[in-house]
């Protein structure tokens, strides 16, 4: 057994190529990337990370530095799940989600990376090893695009090798959403898988009304139609429409996921290892999803989630997100025959190119 001796944490503010807009989060001009490296007594280290939509990253960085680093120093690095559980309780009073879940996620991912490297096992293998690839869709943050630009953008995803796409909905006037959905379906043809994401911008009544209008366009799922913690509201929407529901990116604790499984009548769950508690929590959610007969999917950070989703027997879809974290790694996501391919190397397989990143180092 080797002990944790130190954490080194870095904060980066990474620009996007253009302003991206959805229904609830405002304008995205950049995203924040917080990377933490956990070192053990042998001098080996694992790398973990989390990200934000542009706000809160400095608070996450501070929590890692001030609260988590001294707490886990001296713990047995191999006891990854134990460290996760203890850190959750350590921060429970001020945490139970939010910033603490982001910070805990980064450390947990680093410890899994270290575990894999020391045991010569890939994350794919450690997470279950069911398959080496998974279905993937390209999701845009495109609510602010004109309709012609939206169609052009979605068409470019097909040129990149995807056979599934997702667009944002949630305009104040539902007729605008309907027109855009219709235009995209016409552009991509009847065979391409098509999802829509409202970023919880509708009420229950509005979501039901919108979904009934979307049904004409063969929508694979309706994502986050209403606020994520209205678990019974999801059930009300689900029983009234003929489109499957998906959500999970804004659930930050195992208890929230359990409520969603028990109450919300979802067909797809979308945990994000960057904010639900890391790989440990993501795998616990995956286990719950099998118990409740729900397909396990992901949100964001495709370079990591490709291993987790591929490894599951009930794998759904990998989201390929508009925040291109993998652009700053030595292995951007790979597609072969419309499928995303998991890396086959010890650890998580995510290795950052700090030469690229250091230009944006804000700490």
Predicted features by range, described:
Residues 6, 39-118:
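Metal- or metallocofactor-binding catalytic centers and their adjacent structured scaffolds
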Residues 1-47, 51-53:
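Structured beta-strand/loop patches that form or line metal/cofactor-binding pockets in enzymes
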């Amino acid at each position: 057994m080797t002990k944790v001796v130190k954490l080194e944490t870095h904060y980066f503010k990474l620009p996007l190529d253009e302003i991206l807009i959805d229904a609830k989060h405002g304008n995205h001009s950049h995203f924040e990337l917080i990377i933490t490296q956990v070192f053990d007594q042998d001098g080996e280290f694992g790398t973990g990370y989390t990200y934000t939509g542009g706000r809160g990253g400095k608070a996450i960085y501070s929590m890692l530095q001030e609260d988590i680093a001294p707490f886990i120093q001296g713990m047995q690095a191999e006891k990854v799940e134990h460290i996760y559980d203890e850190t959750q309780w350590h921060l429970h009073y001020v945490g139970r989600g939010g910033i603490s879940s982001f910070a805990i996620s980064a450390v947990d991912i680093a410890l899994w990376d270290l575990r894999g490297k020391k045991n010569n096992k890939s994350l794919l293998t450690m997470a279950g090893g069911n398959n080496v690839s998974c279905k993937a869709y390209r999701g845009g943050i495109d609510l602010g695009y004109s309709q012609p630009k939206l169609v052009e953008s979605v068409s470019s995803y097909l040129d990149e090798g995807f056979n599934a796409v997702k667009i944002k909905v949630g305009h104040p006037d539902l007729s605008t959403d309907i027109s855009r959905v219709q235009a995209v379906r016409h552009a991509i043809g009847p065979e391409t898988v098509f999802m829509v994401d409202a970023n919880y911008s509708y009420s229950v009544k509005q979501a039901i009304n919108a979904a009934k209008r979307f049904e004409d366009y063969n929508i694979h799922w309706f994502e986050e139609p209403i606020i994520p913690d209205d678990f019974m509201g999801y059930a009300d929407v689900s029983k009234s429409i003929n489109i499957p529901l998906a959500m999970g990116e804004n659930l930050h604790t195992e208890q929230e996921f359990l409520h969603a499984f028990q109450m919300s009548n979802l067909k797809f769950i979308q945990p994000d290892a960057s904010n639900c508690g890391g790989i440990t929590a993501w795998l616990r959610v995956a286990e719950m999803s099998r118990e409740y007969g729900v397909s396990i999917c992901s949100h964001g950070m495709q370079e990591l989630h490709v291993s987790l989703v591929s490894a599951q027997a009930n794998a759904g879809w990998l989201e390929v997100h508009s925040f291109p974290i993998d652009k700053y790694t030595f292995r951007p996501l790979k597609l072969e025959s419309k499928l995303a391919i998991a890396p086959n190397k010890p650890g998580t397989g995510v290795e950052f190119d700090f030469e690229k990143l250091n230009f944006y180092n804000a700490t």
